[in-house]
Amino acid sequence: MKKITVVSLALCSFLFGGDLFSVKAQIPEKFTLPTPWTEEALKAEIPLPEYPRPQMVRSEWLNLNGIWDYMGGKDLLDPVTATTPPVFPAKVEKIRVPYPPESELSGIARGGDTCLWYKRSFSVPQAWKGRHVLLNFGAVDRISSVFVNGKKVGTHTGGYDAFSLNITD
């Protein structure tokens, strides 16, 4: 299996369609606005594990929802001019994807971060060798740049638009 590291930057909220790391996002003990689904969402190893695009159903796919490394702030690398991904600190915040950083379910529970960087590694199954591998984003708000193994593979501009990038070697 080939290990892939994806780094993506989005301005505003980022939603992505993986398996869960052994680390956890910081989840509050008490929620400000709990819903009937809050407890169920917290118990899920992979949040929203169902195939997100029924019109394009696939028998083989990898859900990347779960825990990602997160960096947010106002003074981070700009997605438009970024040619390489940022270096994440050794001790980094964790975010539960697909929830936006403003959501308590994300583990971040704050707004105001204008530049958001997400990072995680995953392995492409050996059975996919020789096939096209697409990275599908369910919704990204504003501007995003996506890096795979340190190489910029694409950018996208739009308001909560879905988009795909071909990351085939």
Task: Report the location of each language-model feature.
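Bacterial N-terminal signal peptides that target proteins for export
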Residues: 1-9
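Generic short amphipathic/hydrophobic targeting helices enriched at N-termini
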Residues: 2-3, 19, 91
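Bacterial N-terminal signal peptides
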Residues: 8-19
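N-terminal accessory segment at the very beginning of proteins
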Residues: 21, 25, 45-50, 103-107, ...
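N-terminal pre-domain segments of enzymes
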Residues: 23-62
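Core domains of carbohydrate- and sulfate-ester-processing enzymes
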Residues: 64-115, 167
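Accessory beta-strand-rich segments of carbohydrate-active enzymes
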Residues: 69-73, 107-169
